[in-house]
Amino acid sequence: EALRGEGAVLRNLAGERFMQDADERAELAPRDVVARAIHSQIVAEGDPHVWLDISHLPRNKVLRSFPAIAAHCLQQGVDITSEAIPVAPTQHYFCGGVKTGLRGETSVPGLFACGEVACTGLHGANRLASNSLLEGLVFGHRAARAAVAHARRAPIEVTLGSAAGPGCPRIVSTDPHELRMLRTVQDGMHTTMWQHAGIVRSSRGLASAMEELNALSLNLSGAFTGGEHSLEALEVENLLTVAQLVLACAARRKESRGLHFTRDYVHATDSEKRDTVLSSSDVDLQLTRAMPELVSR
């Protein structure tokens, strides 16, 4: 993104620029537009990447402006001052997350969230470039101060390093069969979410993904038959829950807005200009139209 801002251009396998056809701002278009344009080229050409070319700029300028990028690419055998860089979209940022108030407080007393895990509403439907400091620094500072103030009012009555809670001891799985099963479930979830809940979505794809995740959840249930659960199993279970919430939320939005783009509704509509908050109770997903009442004090 920094390279594009400095004048780098995107080219397909034939060496042709394609961003002018996708948006009048060409390479300076918002990241969701650029990602979809690259995705379209990759699908059409059957190649895993396109090319980012900054070789037309003076060598000294490139090395002075992007020393870290130049060094990293050179380690991979690419001299960005004379060669194009193979690039492809990837999961980079999550605009949704745990709903918080202005100080990182959540609907769970004593639980605070900040950074990419939190949904502050700061970025709307599409984060601008180089804008993460607001989440990490500003809301991190606010959440830390609020957490300290809360702890002083209500001291924690648990010894650090003890059990995470009743019936949930901190243990690491040593069962090879369970570890293989967890890896299979996690890999399947990653593949499904990338294919159906990634850059370009559709109603059919989201429904198919939900069916696949439900099947993976059944496979995972074997890890919870005993009285103790490993951290690995709990983590995969939480990942599946979040993935199901993402799918359910995306399926209910009948429009395209920001990072959420669906082939079935390619334009944004005023009727869908709202927040969507989902809560999970076991495996049942419930849609809440209104935001939970969170008051900062």
Segments predicted by a language model, with ranges:
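FAD/FMN-dependent oxidoreductases across multiple families
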Residues: P67-F112
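An anion/pyrophosphate-binding glycine-rich loop and adjacent beta-alpha core
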Residues: E1-I85, A146-R152
